[in-house]
Amino acid sequence: KHGVLTIRCREKVHFFRGFMKALEYLETHGADSEFELRESACFQSSGAMLDCSRNGVLKVGKIKEYIRRMASLGMNLMMLYTEETYEVPEYPYFGAFRGRYTREELKSCDDYAELFGIEIVPCIQTLAHLHTALRWKTMQGLTDTPDILLAGDDEVYRLIDAMISSVSSAFRSRRVHLGMDEAHELGLG
């Protein structure tokens, strides 16, 4: 009637959810409709995990597209599973030739997500599930088996520290998901 839209929300991302719900309603019922929509989030965090590994490394533009979609759904958490498809400056072959992300690309995604109120949590592999990263000669002294790092080795701990430091420097989140997929053979090599 008056051409006024009021959206009240607690989180930035919920504004985008409210805006999209209003657009959806107006498309269905017409621009002259008067309406009130109410919605409450049932969870403190909701989101999705994108698998950007195993030759499925999404382009930065595609990640940003997912961020927009997630905002329209009111999701405030993106878990970015990169296995080893990110740069670790101290280990130049880590993630090499796999479409790995640069620190700047990851930072760009995080900056974009922040615009919508979405936290990106990096998900990396530690100790195991690192066959592709460990195939290089420069990594051979770090392996227990072809897929698993050598627990107890100081250089392995330096690698893990470098991995965590690398992804932590690209994201605002103070959380890093440390995956240990398929580590059942740890220490058996």
Put a short name on every predicted segment.
Residues 2-189:
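Feature activates predominantly on carbohydrate-active enzymes
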